[in-house]
Amino acid sequence: MFQSYPKLCDILKDKFKFILIDEYQDTNPVVVEIFLQHLKQSNRKNIIGFFGDSMQSIYEDGVGDLNAYIQAGEVYEVQKEQNRRNPSLVIELANRLRTDGIEQHPSTDNHAPNMQDGRVKEGNIKFYYSAQGVDDLETLKRTLDWDFDNAIQTKELNLTHNLIAPKAGFGELMEIYDDDKIIDYKNRITKYIKENNVATDFSEKTFGEVIEILKDGKTGRELNQVNPTPGMQTFIDAHSEQFEDAKQYPFDVFKKIYLDKDSLLDDTKKDKEDENKKGTKRDELIKHLFKIQNNINLYKEERYNEFLRKTEYRISSIADKQSLKDTIVTLDSMSDETIEDVIDYAHDNGICKKDDKFDTFLRDKEYVYTQVKRIKFQVFQNLFYYLEGYTPFSTQHKIKGAEFDNVLVVLDNGNWNKYNFEYLMNVEIFDGLTTLKKSSFEKILNRTQKIFYVCCTRAKENLVVFYNLPSDAIIEKAKMWFGEDNVIRI
């Protein structure tokens, strides 16, 4: 619109004489184009400032850098060379990691966070690796003797939630929401129906009946299109009872079930002081479980007025107070009971009623509830405390902008093919790659360089990087970056 209607450019410049854009590297290129190209249609004056660091452009939909505009004279660059956060050893490491030519140095401000007694803190950097075919991460954590219970001071940074889930104790829930190949197979079937314009009326059919109808009369390649892929079949073979249950659901209901990590993990806090964002993609079952745990916590923290508002629990006598206390004590001790038992107990005792949204979820996504309800409530509680920022675990993307005294960076791709830490620390690997992998090498390397830079520069005191089973080339690169004495085999 700004391109087509110059009057809008006049209005914007009249309204805002100064436009300051924070974290510019994450700004959509179209927005940058509006500010730096389309606004030139107006003769009115204003100033636009971009604040950020291109080395921290870790989101794919961001502009990344303004190099093209700088080279064209559209933007004047003021380089921020003073570093107020990191100790000197981390600053030196960060300078080795930077690819934009900027070299930072400690702030000269004696009141800067990284200054102590008029001098910049030295800090500590270490690169640990395991070479025995055993992941020695837990051994390393015991060796470090950091307080991993203090999520404000100490963080373990992993690339993906999938890597964190088993460590934080909610792996069973993660498998349901992010690794259900039966749902993937359902998606394969619905895609086949749509792309092949299958006109059959399936409204009265079950998922299993639809599969049989589509398979009927097909052989060879045609049959393969409606059969599970090998990966799906492996999952189905291992979860045969679950698959048989899935086949009994009405297809019109089952085809609308979609599962993804956001339904489970959206709105993850950096720490317990972080605020929840408005709106969340969590599904109604997870929201309901959150209400139960929040209500338990409100009572235990003696926030009784807030508890009564949230639950609408009625207290009219001393006996009611004692009954409520007994109920909370019982509910709080049900960690080893199933999620279904906890939901039913909380409902029956007025702690968290099953509302219309919960009932709708149960009706439309019974398949999901059937799996979740069998899991111990402790698994959900582990998820709760992870999402609420009580644990030391965080994804490497989540902590941009944050800072911690102690940072442990785990270099594991987690089967995410957009990143590759081996590329980062052994660029000579390029020559041995296939043609296809060579075509994506630069993009993957760029992403990995920047996420690693972001992770390392979160440390205010101590930085430790861990790599399981590195090659000799990776160890040599680590010695170049961290110093030979700081590269340690566990």
PLM segments and residue spans:
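The feature marks helicase ATPase cores and/or their adjacent C-terminal helical subdomains
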Residues: M1-I490
